[in-house]
Amino acid sequence: MAQRIFTLILLLCSTSVFAGLFDAPGRSQFVPADQAFAFDFQQNQHDLNLTWQIKDGYYLYRKQIRITPEHAKIADVQLPQGVWHEDEFYGKSEIYRDRLTLPVTINQASAGATLTVTYQGCADAGFCYPPETKTVPLSEVVANNEASQPVSVPQQEQPTAQLPFSALWALLIGIGIAFTPCVLPMYPLISGIVLGGKQRLSTARALLLTFIYVQGMALTYTALGLVVAAAGLQFQAALQHPYVLIGLAIVFTLLAMSMFGLFTLQLPSSLQTRLTLMSNRQQGGSPGGVFIMGAIAGLICSPCTTAPLSAILLYIAQSGNMWLGGGTLYLYALGMGLPLMLITVFGNRLLPKSGPWMEQVKTAFGFVILALPVFLLERVIGDIWGLRLWSALGVAFFGWAFITSLQAKRGWMRVVQIILLAAALVSVRPLQDWAFGATHTAQTQTHLNFTQIKTVDELNQALVEAKGKPVMLDLYADWCVACKEFEKYTFSDPQVQKALADTVLLQANVTANDAQDMALLKHLNVLGLPTILFFDGQGQEHPQARVTGFMDAETFSAHLRDRQP
């Protein structure tokens, strides 16, 4: 008897295992958002803790966490650092796994005050949830004597709060600026002034005085960076507006034009004269006087340094990152000061001879500044036009460098010229595709022709108008990485398109996640994206054919053959 019971249990377990093995590949194995990201909160007077218990195999996006107080004032919310996650479409993003605890300080809360918390996450298997919004009721809190601050949740690290290059590049830019025609010839004179006209100083003493001079100059630049970044932080949201980004791009372009010699950009001569007189009153050779000289020198901008400095300051203001602002300007000043330190210690023999090459260095920095408007405009015009702008900039730079290199007489420059010409030819490809319509033609040939719907009523109407044909409904959103993978890799496949030739194709773009989108998702009982639904000729969905998560073209084609009604 016991043996029969054991055999029966084993048979039942085996049946469930095989059912799992041969289960429908499109059936959802994902849990609801509240289970994937279990949210909770706890308030103790001024202290509020928000917690997320994140299920294994799931993660939250740091940049998608938003906190909005209602009838309450809260201190700045500092999100902890996450771990880096990278995908093909969105690049690097910071995410949270396992557990997230976010402390929030309530400075003041009236009766009935609330906190709206918005967050969004995905599964590692390629399934993303719509943004979730939770309302946290707040207990009444009396304001203390400290000044309350408005909420300030960090927005996005990689594209908004960082330069399009490492801050260490500021050091190299500073060194490069030192070799422009307005700066390099002045170094021997500055060296003599710093040393106080004394010719018999020890090497250590000369190096110390020059270092102090550079630190004075760096202090001025660092202070400028901190002030500008702090000002930008107060207007962070406004500085991300498309019109502001376009305005900044125009300013950066004008700054680049000044580096090309179209006009001269510098401080008014009267102000420069006052600053120079203040510097001349300081005593060279003494640490205090040398430090003040350096600090004042940081304010005296020559035509060659004004445009790069203005470009860096404007971009720092746009980023709103104070650490980035101060550090970048400090490295920039240090880069400008390194050649001065070498000249002071080793003499003028280290200086290269002046010549037309210094103007070429200045022009090259004009192209560097032109990269900034392209970087900003990408956020407004999109990736395709952004790629075309990068292409135009690359062609212009490599073309200029190739023409400039033709003046060289050395034999090895022929190799450089070939490399520059090849780089220009590679850079022109996106413009070539645009001009001759290659990209547009490819997109027209490969993309499925979806009919867009928005509401439940529009879906029902489309099912009626299908007139007995099977219907496929694709739920899409810009924030869904796997949805973009479906577009690029699966829906573009000829076999998939052939299998869907007699199917009515509908698509609902729920990127906005507004009331209509949420109503549609709720009506269809959809947890997240990507989700693809199949309806028969009578307008009835076949739940077993539903697809959740990404499928490549081969798997999706097999699914269409086996499961499509």
Curated annotation (Swiss-Prot):
InterPro entries xref list: Cyt_c_assmbl_TM_dom, DsbD_gamma, DsbDN, DsbDN_sf, Thiol_diS_interchange_DbsD, Thioredoxin-like_fold, Thioredoxin-like_sf, Thioredoxin_CS
Disulfide bonds: C122-C128, C182-C304, C480-C483
Gene3D superfamilies: Glutaredoxin, Thiol:disulfide interchange protein DsbD, N-terminal domain
An example molecular function term from Gene Ontology annotations: electron transfer activity
Origin superkingdom: Bacteria
Catalytically driven reaction(s): [protein]-dithiol + NAD(+) = [protein]-disulfide + NADH + H(+); [protein]-dithiol + NADP(+) = [protein]-disulfide + NADPH + H(+)
Record-listed E.C. numbers: 1.8.1.8
Transmembrane segment boundaries: 163-183, 208-228, 243-263, 289-309, 323-343, 357-377, 384-404
Any Gene Ontology CC annotation: plasma membrane
Alphabetized UniProt keyword annotations: Cell inner membrane, Cell membrane, Cytochrome c-type biogenesis, Disulfide bond, Electron transport, Membrane, NAD, Oxidoreductase, Redox-active center, Signal, Transmembrane, Transmembrane helix, Transport
Subcellular location: Cell inner membrane
Class of enzymatic activity (EC top level): oxidoreductase
GO biological process, any: cytochrome complex assembly
All residue ranges annotated as the Thioredoxin domain in the record: 434-565
Membrane-topology annotation of the record: Multi-pass membrane protein
Listed PROSITE patterns: THIOREDOXIN_1, THIOREDOXIN_2
Segment forming the signal sequence: 1-19
Family assignment from sequence similarity: Belongs to the thioredoxin family. DsbD subfamily.
Biological role: Required to facilitate the formation of correct disulfide bonds in some periplasmic proteins and for the assembly of the periplasmic c-type cytochromes. Acts by transferring electrons from cytoplasmic thioredoxin to the periplasm. This transfer involves a cascade of disulfide bond formation and reduction steps.
NCBIfam families attached to this UniProt entry: PRK00293.1
Name of this protein: Thiol:disulfide interchange protein DsbD
